[in-house]
Amino acid sequence: MCASVKSNIRGPALIPRMKTKHRIYYVTLFSIVLLGLIATGMFQFWPHSIESSSDGGVEKRSIREVPVVRLPTDSPIPERGDLSCRMHTCFDVYRCGFNPKNKIKVYIYPLKKYVDDAGVPVSSAISREYNELLTAISDSDYYTDDINRACLFVPSIDVLNQNPLRIKETAQALAQLSRWDRGTNHLLFNMLPGAPPDYNTALDVPRDRALLAGGGFSTWTYRQGYDVSIPVFSPLSAEMALPEKAPGPRRYFLLSSQMAIHPEYREELEALQAKHQESVLVLDKCTNLSEGVLSVRKRCHQHQVFDYPQVLQEATFCTVLRGARLGQAVLSDVLQAGCVPVVIADSYILPFSEVLDWKRASVVVPEEKMSDVYSILQNIPQRQIEEMQRQARWFWEAYFQSIKAIALATLQIINDRIYPYAAISYEEWNDPPAVKWASVSNPLFLPLIPPQSQGFTAIVLTYDRVESLFRVITEVSKVPSLSKLLVVWNNQNKNPPEESLWPKIRVPLKVVRTAENKLSNRFFPYDEIETEAVLAIDDDIIMLTSDELQFGYEVWREFPDRLVGYPGRLHLWDHEMNKWKYESEWTNEVSMVLTGAAFYHKYFNYLYTYKMPGDIKNWVDTHMNCEDIAMNFLVANVTGKAVIKVTPRKKFKCPECTAIDGLSLDQTHMVERSECINKFASVFGTMPLKVVEHRADPVLYKDDFPEKLKSFPNIGSL
């Protein structure tokens, strides 16, 4: 261009107009393509959501802003993984500290570009999977952008797949991390460990004390209680919207879908197929597919082509065999299909086996028993198979279906180790939502820290017996451990007394007016209940002394998962009528304590209100009876334990109450109580009540000992 202009200074340039337009067009197009390539490179090098922005959110930074770190050849290299590491030896729990939410804080290191002395990058661009993993962590409640608050550190160095890694240089990059400290409290994620020809079952990168969330651990490389065994993520099952299939018998009893398996294993499987014919299907790689058909989504048997992973839904059991690596992505595909995995891989540590009960969802068969696998599976009852099919699908939905699910499950396991008193229960890990107790966690464990609120809350259900109510309030207020008194006013046609008329007591007194007159109102989880212990007491129970109530509370503190009460009752089997009978006579046994005066954990208010099986709650409210029996059934069914009757008192008759006031005096009432027991037993599908022949009394009760020296001198008479 310059030469042309110089040689034609006396006239216009000799470039035709159309040619100039075309050149401008191509230059512009080239510029756009170049900018697009630069933008694509920036996106690939930078993972989503790992840098904290000024507003506390997450931002994506330009590749130009990523600092370059040069690693000299003699940079320090961490020691190889310490196989003796356990949480109490290699993890610094003091970095985590105590916090009210019992949540660890996880810090993600900023992205850096590591290069060697020659300027060659140590690793390639961060993979899509690792990008998703970092995003999941940064979007979670665990994430913190303050390195000083962090308990756990996650590098932005992608080691998910060992294949492209430069082992030495990657280890040197890890050692450059600002808080590395021999890998203490650092977490690495790796799904494809090892390299040919040996294919080690754990990441070969030297990592010292760092925790490893690895896919494909063996019993030789897995540090139990320290490392976390995770699934090998399957993009195929994650991208395939495979509808859930109802449990039950399927076309094939046993199916093998893996392609690259050892020839000896394939011979064993083909021998089973030859023996059992159409009930066994052994698939292999397709060799006759049309051009353009994705081979990864097809499997073949002889010349028959099957869609994969859809074909897995046609089988009851699916084999999961070791390949070059011990961990296989096919496990995720099998679980998604609701096919029960038959794991034939000796020494394999199943994913999340620290918390997941794999006996409920899989069958593990030793490799030497592979020829007997068909007969082994035939011995499993059909009902159990269907439960395993449901459980397999549930495991995939909860823990396998996405990188996010894998990341959060890993962090939860580590969190449970650090805060064991707030750990997720076995049921919460393993029970599908249809059978677990929903969002409120069961607090009935051995606590490692004291409850936030001591004492108990007394809940008095009343309708219009004001004089008796005031006497109950006065007596209960004398109990030293009383924290609050809550009156549930169940009368919609009459206002409660004016505030000035209520007894003056030392603890807060709150009146709650209900919208409807229901007995179940006494078991509602009111926000005003701040203590763990609840005393349910009727407005006519005026005979209990403060010593009796205080002793009952202290017994409950020793057994917080029990119903601890005073009026004892019994259920009996009537052989003549062939049904259950309610018994209120004095006997040597009890199986219930009435909630007219009983202590229990406030957790059961939640279960009673929101999780009571069947129509029991509506039955109680309709018949205006048996709410106490329903609570006894509920507690016994949840805990599997009997009630505890305290103190010898058996008479709970209100001296001023007439026969009209006292429902228990009516013979019809007793018949209805028997009907309730039979109704509830039918709904629960069992009789959960446990019969016991003992009660709890103070140690010095009836001993010839000075009353002044007894802790509970006024226990009272029968």
Curated annotation (Swiss-Prot):
Tissue localization of expression: Expressed in heart, brain, spleen, lung, liver, skeletal muscle and testis. Heart shows a high expression.
Residues that, per the record, bind UDP: L461, R465, N490, N517, D538, D539
UniProt modification remark: N-glycosylated at Asn-637.
Cofactor: Mn(2+)
Ranges of the Lumenal topological domain: 47-718
Pfam families documented for this protein: Exostosin_GT47, Glyco_transf_64
Topological relation to the membrane, as annotated: Single-pass type II membrane protein
Reactions performed catalytically: 3-O-{[(1->4)-beta-D-GlcA-(1->4)-alpha-D-GlcNAc](n)-(1->4)-beta-D-GlcA-(1->3)-beta-D-Gal-(1->3)-beta-D-Gal-(1->4)-beta-D-Xyl}-L-seryl-[protein] + UDP-N-acetyl-alpha-D-glucosamine = 3-O-{alpha-D-GlcNAc-[(1->4)-beta-D-GlcA-(1->4)-alpha-D-GlcNAc](n)-(1->4)-beta-D-GlcA-(1->3)-beta-D-Gal-(1->3)-beta-D-Gal-(1->4)-beta-D-Xyl}-L-seryl-[protein] + UDP + H(+)
Full protein name: Exostosin-2
